[in-house]
């Protein structure tokens, strides 16, 4: 054995015996009775803090990207449209009730009524509308389709009844109301919008099932003649605003149906021609057209309403003068609780309030487009497109008039302005969208595994059953999906 091997063997510890550390801990060097803490944990903590400080800019740079990914995943979830429609519509309705309460008190007192008269009527309509929304959201699609033809027939009958002398009532220069005695009045043309959406969607869906929509005559007939009949009955009463919305619904249905560009452009040209004729044939409508962008009341104060709507918005500032503190509603601004409630909202809640209202309507529009784009059911696609076109067109016409960008058309802000005749069919239409959003396959699966709510658990307890667990709900959903897949395979 060489001398180097002998030295290595001397340094190697014996078997079963642990080598003593060359640098014993400080506690051992200090003696048995003293305990000096080890400095290595402190150095480790300082090293970790230094590493976090060094990496902090990189984490901050990745933060916006991470938030963007999370937001994208949230928007792509199966129940996004369902919650946007349900939450957005209820928030708009509640905020509308608050603004009707604020904007209508002076108007009611000037009319010799109780200050809360209009608010109480709107509250009753909102409760009934919420019930209609819930009923429509739970109805199966086949029942929606079954109601299409009766709804159209009833709407046409009531709209024709308005034109009978002694029955129809004129409000604001338009003869489009039915008075059923007392404070209860009905505007049948509002239900005509809903009827056109449901009937038009069912008609186009049937034609698509028969492969007939590739022919232009099947795409136009009888949809366009029926829409022209509704438009004619509305224009007999002089309601140009509602006629424009019905035209927007027709264009929305044709667009979703995939009408050729030439056909679509022809329909738009005919509609524009009829609109020009309607404006030029009425001096009152021409006065409203001249008031677009006006800065003075004009002769006879024809632009008074639009001008004071701009004043209300301009005086609101960023956060408004405070709820109930509007000055324009004190007799200066006509119709502050109906057509120009958005102006009062801007004055009392400021730019923040108006942008919030716009954001809620934008959420409804996005959800409607998403439902129409993701479904495989033809009726759902056409009905969702029609309802979305209806609500968005009405929002644009109302807010455009308040901003002075469009002529005043006497159109209320959907789900927001005072008026039960406008609120009830609009909430039923939103209920249709909610039902369509629930009917998506991914949404059904997500709802099946969602934890049971309080009412569902209480119902099971009262029935003598134990509350269903999440695992059981997931198992039930998987079984249902397997059964549907098996049926499709067969």
Task: Name every feature range the model reports, one short phrase each.
Residues 1-67, 71, 399-490:
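A juxtamembrane structural motif centered on a specific transmembrane helix
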Residues 64-80, 113:
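Cytosolic juxtamembrane amphipathic/interface segments immediately preceding
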Residues 75-79, 215, 219-220, 330-333, ...:
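Helix-boundary and loop/linker segments of multi-pass membrane transporters
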Residues 86-102, 108-305, 343-401, 428-432, ...:
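Hydrophobic alpha-helical transmembrane segments of multi-pass inner membrane proteins, especially
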Residues 161, 230-238, 315-319, 397, ...:
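Transmembrane alpha-helix interface/packing and boundary motifs in multi-pass membrane proteins
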Residues 239-244, 320-326, 336-338, 355, ...:
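Transmembrane helix boundary and interhelical junction motifs in multipass membrane proteins
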Residues 291, 295-341, 349-353:
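TM-adjacent membrane-interface loops and short helices in multi-pass inner/ER membrane proteins
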């Amino acid at each position: 054995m060489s001398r180097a091997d002998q030295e290595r063997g001397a340094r190697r510890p014996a078997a079963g015996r642990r080598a003593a550390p060359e640098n014993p801990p400080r506690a051992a060097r200090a003696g048995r009775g003293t305990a000096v803490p080890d400095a290595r944990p402190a150095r480790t903590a300082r090293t970790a803090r230094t590493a976090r400080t060094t990496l902090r800019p990189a984490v901050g740079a990745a933060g916006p990207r991470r938030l963007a990914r999370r937001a994208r995943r949230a928007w792509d979830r199966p129940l996004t449209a369902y919650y946007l429609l349900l939450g957005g519509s209820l928030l708009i309705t509640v905020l509308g009730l608050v603004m009707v309460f604020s904007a209508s008190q002076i108007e009611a007192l000037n009319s010799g009524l109780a200050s809360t008269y209009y608010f109480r009527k709107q509250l009753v309509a909102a409760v009934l509308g919420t019930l209609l929304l819930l009923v429509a959201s739970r109805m199966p699609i086949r029942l929606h389709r079954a109601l299409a033809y009766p709804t159209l027939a009833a709407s046409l009958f009531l709209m024709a009844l308005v034109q009978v002398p002694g029955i129809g009532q004129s409000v604001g220069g338009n003869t489009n109301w039915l008075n059923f005695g007392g404070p209860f009045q009905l505007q049948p043309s509002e239900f005509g919008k809903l009827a056109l959406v449901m009937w038009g969607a069912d008609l186009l869906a049937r034609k698509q099932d028969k492969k007939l929509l590739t022919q232009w005559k099947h795409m136009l007939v009888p949809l366009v003649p029926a829409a022209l009949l509704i438009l004619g009955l509305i224009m007999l009463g002089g309601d140009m605003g509602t006629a424009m919305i019905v035209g927007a619904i027709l264009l929305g249905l044709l667009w979703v149906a995939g009408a050729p560009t030439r056909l679509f452009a022809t329909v738009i040209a005919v509609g524009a021609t009829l609109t020009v004729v309607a404006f030029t044939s009425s001096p009152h409508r021409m006065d409203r057209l001249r008031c677009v962008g006006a800065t003075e009341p004009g002769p006879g104060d024809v632009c008074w309403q639009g001008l004071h709507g701009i004043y209300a918005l301009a005086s609101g500032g960023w956060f408004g003068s405070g709820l109930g503190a509007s000055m324009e509603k004190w007799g200066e601004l006509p119709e502050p609780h109906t057509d120009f409630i958005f102006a009062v909202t801007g004055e009392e809640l400021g730019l923040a309030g108006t942008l919030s209202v716009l954001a809620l309507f934008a959420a409804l529009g996005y959800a409607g487009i998403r439902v129409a784009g993701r479904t495989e059911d033809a009726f759902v696609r056409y009905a969702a497109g029609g309802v979305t076109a209806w609500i968005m067109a009405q929002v644009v016409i109302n807010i455009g008039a308040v901003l002075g960008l469009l002529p005043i058309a006497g159109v209320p802000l959907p789900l927001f302005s005072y008026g039960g005749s406008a609120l009830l069919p609009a909430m039923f239409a939103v209920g249709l969208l909610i039902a369509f959003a629930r009917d998506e396959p991914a949404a059904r699966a997500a709802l099946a595994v969602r934890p049971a709510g309080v009412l569902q658990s209480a119902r099971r307890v009262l029935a003598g059953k134990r509350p269903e667990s999440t695992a059981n709900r997931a198992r039930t959903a998987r079984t249902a999906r397997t059964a549907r897949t098996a049926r499709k395979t067969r």
